[in-house]
């Protein structure tokens, strides 16, 4: 797996011949990996939040509505982190500050 990653990163420079294009190609790779990791972390966090809410509601059905409200607030905060990663990726891809 490491050999494939190094091969892709090494050949990206030759695939895009110009100097500015090399930075842009690495930005695309980094943006894709970063956004994928952010989405993965967000999905794991949302799954854990939903599991904890369902478990709490099963233990004490009387507080189910309060737990649901808290869960929705937590899900919004988790999703906000993924949206921040998307915004940073879009900035790096379209208004790349490294290109000057």
From Swiss-Prot:
The protein's topology relative to the membrane is: Multi-pass membrane protein
* Main subcellular location of this protein, as a coarse class: membrane
- One Pfam family it belongs to: ATP-synt_C
User: What SUPFAM superfamilies does this protein's entry cite?
Assistant: F1F0 ATP synthase subunit C
Q: Where in the cell is it found?
A: Cell inner membrane
What sections of the protein cross the membrane?
27-47, 72-92
Instruction: Give the superkingdom in one word.
Output: Bacteria
Q: Which CDD domains match?
A: ATP-synt_Fo_c
Instruction: Name any one GO molecular function.
Output: proton-transporting ATP synthase activity, rotational mechanism
Q: Which keywords accompany this UniProt record?
A: ATP synthesis, Cell inner membrane, Cell membrane, CF(0), Hydrogen ion transport, Ion transport, Lipid-binding, Membrane, Transmembrane, Transmembrane helix, Transport
Site described as Reversibly protonated during proton transport, located at 79
Q: Which GO terms describe its cellular component?
A: plasma membrane; proton-transporting ATP synthase complex; proton-transporting two-sector ATPase complex, proton-transporting domain
Assembly and partners are described as: F-type ATPases have 2 components, F(1) - the catalytic core - and F(0) - the membrane proton channel. F(1) has five subunits: alpha(3), beta(3), gamma(1), delta(1), epsilon(1). F(0) has three main subunits: a(1), b(2) and c(10-14). The alpha and beta chains form an alternating ring which encloses part of the gamma chain. F(1) is attached to F(0) by a central stalk formed by the gamma and epsilon chains, while a peripheral stalk is formed by the delta and b chains.
To which protein family does this belong? Answer: Belongs to the ATPase C chain family.
Job of this protein: F(1)F(0) ATP synthase produces ATP from ADP in the presence of a proton or sodium gradient. F-type ATPases consist of two structural domains, F(1) containing the extramembraneous catalytic core and F(0) containing the membrane proton channel, linked together by a central stalk and a peripheral stalk. During catalysis, ATP synthesis in the catalytic domain of F(1) is coupled via a rotary mechanism of the central stalk subunits to proton translocation.
What name does UniProt use for this protein?
Answer: ATP synthase subunit c
- Name the source organism: Campylobacter concisus (strain 13826)
